[in-house]
């Protein structure tokens, strides 16, 4: 059959006369490069259908335009160029185009003391939208960290004090006896509870932002929290992590405030939202805190 004779149903008029906010495709597989790493991403891409009389959009045009990013570095300039192409191919139908890129960035992280290192995945989402008001970009990342409960730590210290008083009340203190006692389960009778916790950070990028600040955001967040989860460890690393947790007690409220202060220092941010979840080991529910700045 001659290709020119193939029917194009999407180009036909509709009888409903109703514009649609967004029409497109979700979950398109796409290999990309991000922060120097090759990874597989999932992309949602679409346009508004502002012509109320048009039955549909040209999805194949969006799909083919997206393939121009395959295997290439994902940059703000590349995203803007892609959205411009989407609008150009739908100039008679659409006033806005948008896409979401989802994936997990693998980063190598060193151990605290030893020469070991390992890889961690950082889930991310990049949201981009082009409309009559210009380009709008948002970046979202997730990172895991350890949190030790300050209340539980205080209760554990109290129990240790009580056991010390019971053990040495009727005898003069001897340095070696106390040292042995401190290294025994008889002496350290309680430990505070800790849990793996997750922070979700949403950053709205400033208009003058040139590069995706993914690494800068992750580094700032992990510095603020102080106890990011580890990868490969030896006993010396595990001991250093125990020390870091003991000197870094925090409720979910503390974590949210630390992250808020850290994100306020990022020049690439015009607005942000923070959400932390502490998956409590004491309770059957989570402890959650949120903070935001200039977010609406």
From Swiss-Prot:
Q: Which reaction does it catalyse?
A: GTP + H2O = 7,8-dihydroneopterin 3'-triphosphate + formate + H(+)
Any single GO molecular-function term of the entry would be: GTP cyclohydrolase I activity
Q: What is its EC number?
A: 3.5.4.16
| Functional pathway | Cofactor biosynthesis; 7,8-dihydroneopterin triphosphate biosynthesis; 7,8-dihydroneopterin triphosphate from GTP: step 1/1
State the UniProt keywords alphabetically: Hydrolase
Q: Which family does it belong to?
A: Belongs to the GTP cyclohydrolase IV family.
Q: Protein name, please?
A: GTP cyclohydrolase FolE2
Q: Which gene encodes it?
A: folE2
